[in-house]
From Swiss-Prot:
PANTHER family per the UniProt record, alphabetical: HEAT SHOCK PROTEIN 70KDA (PTHR19375)
Record region (Disordered): 57-80
Transmembrane segments: none
Species name: Leishmania major
Compositional bias of kind Basic and acidic residues: 68-80
Protein name: Heat shock 70-related protein 4
PROSITE patterns: HSP70_1, HSP70_2
Superkingdom of origin: Eukaryota
Statement: the UniProt record of this protein carries the keyword Repressor: no
Length: 228
């Protein structure tokens, strides 16, 4: 197995990719030179645009631009989904009992699940090979702490479809704690750590302990509509 691994953060508003190499993490710039990529996927008559590419095409129909996908809800009748749908420019419909997104793509009406769209973002963020000069396939993908099993599996599937070997799906606050602990390997005894993860659209708080390199989550809570 390669000793170099991706760490991909598919966020609500921005996504980024880091590479763990030589005991440290480097955040990789995208093809626009930015270290974070807008979490947008847009569809035109001829192509699919991801991230910064969508921002340069501001004149494209907003109904074909999908965002806010970290707010994945598997049940279409949930009040929070119904509320969000009033503000989204894109259309959400029911297919096989689950909400999917309907867009006009290549002159056809097509539907995509969150996993389908996550694949595009993962594929875009997974391109660390150009930075390293070698192919990197192993990846760890972080998700909000409140994600359930089906949401985590959808994220893992998206990475696999993008050609990545997804080693683990871990909570974003846990990833932050691991990064904190990496710089304090010499610390003795048990430490209590409180992680505040305020993102562009979600908020998580996690309480955990660190002792001898072992991380144990004691409690976690969050708000899926608090961020900015």
């Amino acid at each position: 197995m390669s000793s170099t691994k991706h760490r991909i953060d598919l966020g609500t508003t921005y996504s980024c990719v880091g590479v763990f190499k030589n005991e440290q993490v480097d955040i990789i710039a995208n093809d626009q030179g930015n270290r974070t990529t807008p979490s947008y996927v847009a569809f035109t008559e001829t192509e699919r645009l991801i991230g910064d590419a969508r921002r340069t095409r501001w004149h494209e129909p907003p109904g074909n631009t999908v965002f806010d996908e970290a707010h994945d809800r598997p049940q279409v009748r949930r009040p929070d989904l119904q509320s969000d749908m009033k503000h989204w420019p894109f259309k959400v419909i029911v297919k096989d009992g689950k909400p999917v997104i309907s867009v006009e793509y290549q002159n056809q009406t097509k539907t995509f699940s969150r996993g389908d769209l996550g694949y595009g973002a993962a594929e875009n963020e997974g391109d660390g090979g150009g930075y390293l000069g070698t192919t990197v396939k192993d990846a760890v993908i972080t998700v909000p702490a409140y994600f359930n099993d089906s949401q985590r599996q959808a994220t893992k599937d998206a990475g696999s479809i993008a050609g990545l070997n997804v080693l683990r799906i871990i909570n974003e606050p846990t990833a932050a704690a691991i990064a904190y602990g990496m710089d304090r390997k010499g610390d003795k005894g048990e430490k209590n750590v409180l992680i505040f993860d305020l993102g562009g659209g979600t908020f998580d708080v996690t309480l955990l302990t660190i002792e001898s390199g072992v991380f144990e989550v004691k409690a976690t809570a969050g708000d899926t509509h608090l961020g900015g």
